[in-house]
Amino acid sequence: KDIEERVREERHARRSNSVNLWFGPDTWPVKQGDVVAYSGDSGSSGGPHLHYEIRDTETQRLYNPVREGIIRPRDEYPPRIVRLHYVEVDTVQGVPVRSVPESYAVVRTAAGRYALTHDGPVGVGRRGYFVAEVTDRRNDVWNSFGVWRVTAFADGIPCFEFRMDSFTYDISRCSDAVSCYPIQINSRNEAIRLAQLEGAPDSFYPTMAERGLIRT
């Protein structure tokens, strides 16, 4: 039986259009040279399509296929910081409150370093965190990409690191916890919160001091 027929049978048997199915390794064996699916213009995100992941069988941790050298796309464009935002946080009668983000445009110099277009130092409150709005491109495609790793330094010392690779399947649902949603919904870039959201998995943050909060 092919996948479509098997899924249809399971949906009818369970009387539900929404089903999560788990199959054994021998259900649909794949040999080298077999066609599993087609990508590109044969499908789109507006209809049924496939996402591929490469995971370690024993740990179920993701492999980053580019970092591991499994695929080597042509990529001559470094990731780019577009804006930097600062959000002050506090607690009022036990309820967390956040200020409206203060936003600063960023330019990349010829030396490859970044500078704010804002004159003078950035003013920060008693406690807060930064949000980096970033994007990435790659040769030969029109897509824009997010980033899988961000490291923040204070006085030359790493104080925060976010890594979005090698996590297990069961915490995939938490992957958006690294985004700053109020900024993300109005941006075409990735808005990475440089602080750990309450409830976000610790494994996303191999380096962490004060949950990424900047205190003055």
Q: Where do the PLM segments sit?
A:
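Acidic, glycine-rich catalytic/binding loops that coordinate metals and/or anionic ligands
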Residues: 3-28, 53-136, 140-145, 159, ...
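A structural signal for short beta-strand/turn segments enriched in small hydrophobics and glycine
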Residues: 27-39
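Local beta-strand/beta-hairpin segments that build beta-sheet-rich folds
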Residues: 36-37, 81, 157-159, 216
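Inter-heme linker and motif-flanking segments adjacent to c-type heme-binding CXXCH motifs
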Residues: 36-43, 137-141
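Active-site loop architecture of trypsin-fold serine endopeptidases
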Residues: 39-53
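Beta-strand signatures of extracellular beta-sandwich domains
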Residues: 149-153
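Beta-strand-rich ligand-recognition modules
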Residues: 162-216
